């Protein structure tokens, strides 16, 4: 009797095991079949995906901000894993990760988390530039070369909208600065009241080449010089998403100040984090050392839980010196900011508020101006580059600059925008206008 029971148990185990392996084999075969027309093998795609999420979960210093902004990271991770087999080529790989990183930020801009932008390639060589480590990386540049070819092919075949829709993206290319009209479109000027109030709207601080940068500087200097006899200069950054920080420093502040200005801010970081160590070793141009007492440093109540993710505080000081010869302007400067203002434009707003270079009017910016240098990661199989800030910039009140932005000196008056509020403020200061 016992022998029969043992035989039955063994038979059941054998049949069960065989059934399991048959089902597992069938499932694995079906799973592999999904990747038959994919850009890379299942293993390679999943390795790249895991690499990205390792950074998001263990290195990205703004993860908590994304969660507070409403992003469900676990759901996003599961949802996008299912989409991996749909990636067909370099263009779709690029758009897949652009879409993923946007969703992680709940469609906001938090700490410059993104793919390395194809529009940032060197316009002469079509190679990656300004990354320190990957500018001459053969695999990275090969990926971006093929990406450009795929983009051109999609445009020629009128497939751009279809592919963008597939990855839930709506992209607008940057203004073409390579033509004179393109450069002019970055500036809008008008005289609001002759010899009293001049207005300058700067839509970007981004330039692609040294040649364009020099043309940009020359044009901006010409505009500011033409306004030097005015009592009030209004600089509008409400549509400015940033670019090259040296442009606002060299082209606006230096020509207009009479004595050097000192700008100070702090960043938090985790000195033991593997990604931070890579950043310090390969991407940070100056030695990063904790020079503040971390434990006594107070985070704002709004982002206090984030403090446990860090162990160090570093204070930065930037000194901007007057340009000689300077622009002979002695009037008041007003800086308009809004929710779109970010990155280098946010840094300019923070500088203006701290140093009193300008009276800052509007609403909180989107931030991202106080996080220092960019950090780049190369995906192990595709060689796509992703980027992020690794240092956590802090406002003077201990709040996170990438979450709360820079607050203005004067908020918009009820029912009025920043320009209208600025003009009202000028009136109250005694300016005689006809508005």
Name every feature range the model reports, one short phrase each.
Residues 4-9, 13-269, 274, 278-285, ...:
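Flexible, low-complexity junctional segments that flank or bridge functional domains
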Residues 246-417:
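Conserved acidic, small-residue-rich alpha-beta core segments centered on
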């Amino acid at each position: 009797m016992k022998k029969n029971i043992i035989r039955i148990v063994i038979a059941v185990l054998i049949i069960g095991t065989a059934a399991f392996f048959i089902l597992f084999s069938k499932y694995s075969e079906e799973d592999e079949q999904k990747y038959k027309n994919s850009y890379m093998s299942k293993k390679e795609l999943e390795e790249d995906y895991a690499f990205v999420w390792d950074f998001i979960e263990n290195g990205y210093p703004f993860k908590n901000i994304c969660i507070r902004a409403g992003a469900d990271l676990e759901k996003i991770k599961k949802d996008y894993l299912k989409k991996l087999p749909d990636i067909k080529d370099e263009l779709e790989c690029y758009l897949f990760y652009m879409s993923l990183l946007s969703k992680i930020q709940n469609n906001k801009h938090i700490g410059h988390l993104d793919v390395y932008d194809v529009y940032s390639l060197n316009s002469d060589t079509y190679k990656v530039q300004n990354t320190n480590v990957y500018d001459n990386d053969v695999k990275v540049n090969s990926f971006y070369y093929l990406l450009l070819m795929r983009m051109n092919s999609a445009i020629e075949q009128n497939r751009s909208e279809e592919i963008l829709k597939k990855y839930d993206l709506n992209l607008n290319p940057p203004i073409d600065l390579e033509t004179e009209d393109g450069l002019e479109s970055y500036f809008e000027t008008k005289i609001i009241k002759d010899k009293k109030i001049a207005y300058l709207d700067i839509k970007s601080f981004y330039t692609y080449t040294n040649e364009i940068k020099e043309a940009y500087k020359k044009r901006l200097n010409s505009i500011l010089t033409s306004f030097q006899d005015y009592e009030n200069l209004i600089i509008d950054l409400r549509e400015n998403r940033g670019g090259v920080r040296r442009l606002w420093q060299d082209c606006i502040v230096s020509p207009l100040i009479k004595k050097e200005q000192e700008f100070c801010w702090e960043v938090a970081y985790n000195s033991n984090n593997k990604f931070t160590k890579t950043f310090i070793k390969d991407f940070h141009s100056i030695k990063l050392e904790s020079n503040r007492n971390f434990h006594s440093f107070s985070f704002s109540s709004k982002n206090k839980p984030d403090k446990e993710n860090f162990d160090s505080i570093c204070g930065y000081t930037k000194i901007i010196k007057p340009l000689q010869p300077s622009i002979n302007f002695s009037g008041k400067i007003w800086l308009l900011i809004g929710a779109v203002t970010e990155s280098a434009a946010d840094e300019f707003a923070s500088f203006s508020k701290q140093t009193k270079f300008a009276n800052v009017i509007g609403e909180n910016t989107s931030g991202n101006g106080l996080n220092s240098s960019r950090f780049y990661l190369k995906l192990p199989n595709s060689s796509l580059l992703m980027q992020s800030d690794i240092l956590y910039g802090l406002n003077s009140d201990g709040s996170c600059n990438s979450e709360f932005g820079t607050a203005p000196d004067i908020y918009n008056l009820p029912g009025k925008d920043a320009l209208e509020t600025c003009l009202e403020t000028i009136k109250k200061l005694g300016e005689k206008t006809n508005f």
